[in-house]
């Protein structure tokens, strides 16, 4: 297969995965946006975490809320727990990498805040501990997962929301995660500030 054929194949795989995910995920994304808007209207904030590409997604979500998405609007309170290398390496060195997010959540999280927890497998130990810490702090969890939801899915409470991408390929799951994040940002803006039609 030549390179351009491979590129077309990858584009088509991404399109197919998004098409399959659209109807499955729409109600979950809607519910997650409502949970987030309710938190923001009640003086809550968004915390987000993930590893690797999912850390990038956590930061992307946080920056869209803090700065802007596609319209001018006031900044919204959001903290990506993936950005402070001194804190992360300190916790990893003194305790364990599994606690790099949970310790931050125990310090920063308040009842009514929302944790956006991102893992393509749903099995990242530090994300699982982050969810447990969020529940201890009476936070609501929005989980972006893939495959079978992993250990994260079994930890979620009735008030939590799982957005599970119906795919098994990490790259395809990540692509849908980013689209879901953009949908969340759009829905948050429209619910808080009105539609821009």
Swiss-Prot record:
Cofactor remark: Binds 1 zinc ion per subunit.
Residues that, per the record, bind substrate: 51-53, 64, 93-94, 119-121, 124, 174
Record's subcellular location: Cytoplasm
Alphabetical UniProt keywords: Carbohydrate metabolism, Cytoplasm, Isomerase, Metal-binding, Zinc
Principal localisation: cytoplasm
PROSITE patterns named among the record's database cross-references: SIS
Keyword flag Methyltransferase: no
Reaction(s) catalysed by this chain's protein: 2 D-sedoheptulose 7-phosphate = D-glycero-alpha-D-manno-heptose 7-phosphate + D-glycero-beta-D-manno-heptose 7-phosphate
Cofactors demanded by this protein: Zn(2+)
EC number, as in UniProt: 5.3.1.28
Binding site for Zn(2+): 60, 64, 174, 182
Stored SUPFAM superfamilies: SIS domain
GO cellular component: cytoplasm
Keyword Thylakoid: no
GO molecular function, one term: carbohydrate derivative binding
Function: Catalyzes the isomerization of sedoheptulose 7-phosphate in D-glycero-D-manno-heptose 7-phosphate.
Family according to the record: Belongs to the SIS family. GmhA subfamily.
NCBIfam families named among the record's database cross-references: PRK13936.1
Subunit structure, as described in the record: Homotetramer.
Protein's UniProt name: Phosphoheptose isomerase
Lineage, uppermost ranks: Bacteria, Pseudomonadati, Pseudomonadota, Gammaproteobacteria, Pseudomonadales
Gene that specifies this protein: gmhA
């Amino acid at each position: 297969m030549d390179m351009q054929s491979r590129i077309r194949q990858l584009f088509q795989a991404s399109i197919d995965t998004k098409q399959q995910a659209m109807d499955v995920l729409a109600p979950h994304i809607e519910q997650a946006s409502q949970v987030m808007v309710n938190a923001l209207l009640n003086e809550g904030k968004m915390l987000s975490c993930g590893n690797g590409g999912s850390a990038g997604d956590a930061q992307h979500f946080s920056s869209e809320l803090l700065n802007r998405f596609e319209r001018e609007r006031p900044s919204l309170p959001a903290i990506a727990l993936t950005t402070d290398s001194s804190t992360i390496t300190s916790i990893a060195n003194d305790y364990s990498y599994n606690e790099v997010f949970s310790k931050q959540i125990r310090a920063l999280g308040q009842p009514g805040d929302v944790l956006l927890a991102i893992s393509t497998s749903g099995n990242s130990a530090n994300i699982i501990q982050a969810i447990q810490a969020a529940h201890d702090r009476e936070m609501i969890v929005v989980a972006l997962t893939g495959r079978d939801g992993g250990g994260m899915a079994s930890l979620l409470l009735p008030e939590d929301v799982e957005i599970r991408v119906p795919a098994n390929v990490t790259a395809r799951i990540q692509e849908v995660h980013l689209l879901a994040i953009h949908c969340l940002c759009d829905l948050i803006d429209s619910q808080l500030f009105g539609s821009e039609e």
